[in-house]
């Protein structure tokens, strides 16, 4: 008989830098998960993606064991890196903070494709393009 899931925890953590300090410690501690073991395993699986925020979905079972699934980095983080900006515009419809090329958009869409609700790359590009527009990043050819 499969183990029963008691909690599903979603966190967005810096790759290779998870520590037992908040937000990890309190989120996992209240469900009885071994925090140090999770941090060590997460850091080992994300070392090659240093500098990015990697969302993680942790399933906690009734015997206090856990499994976790790593998601793709948020499109906003990938776009900010591609445009070489720290953060998006406070007023995206008036102030543009950077620009990305169509090729960079396609590359980001390919990275994000497994986590998007589409299977077609053209739709994924449009989704990422909308995120760029909302951040005040222009798309150039």
From Swiss-Prot:
Q: Recite the UniProt keywords alphabetically.
A: Chloroplast, Plastid, Ribonucleoprotein, Ribosomal protein, RNA-binding, rRNA-binding
Q: Does the keyword Protease apply?
A: no
Instruction: Please name the GO terms of the biological process aspect recorded for this protein, alphabetically.
Output: translation
The gene designation is: rpl11
Q: Which organism is it from?
A: Thalassiosira pseudonana
Q: Which GO terms describe its cellular component?
A: chloroplast; mitochondrial large ribosomal subunit
* Known partners and oligomeric status: Part of the ribosomal stalk of the 50S ribosomal subunit. Interacts with L10 and the large rRNA to form the base of the stalk. L10 forms an elongated spine to which L12 dimers bind in a sequential fashion forming a multimeric L10(L12)X complex.
What name does this protein carry? Large ribosomal subunit protein uL11c
Q: Which family does it belong to?
A: Belongs to the universal ribosomal protein uL11 family.
Please tell me whether the keyword Ribosomal protein is annotated for this protein: yes
Function per UniProt: Forms part of the ribosomal stalk which helps the ribosome interact with GTP-bound translation factors.
Q: Which Gene3D superfamilies match?
A: Ribosomal protein L11, C-terminal domain (1.10.10.250), Ribosomal protein L11/L12, N-terminal domain (3.30.1550.10)
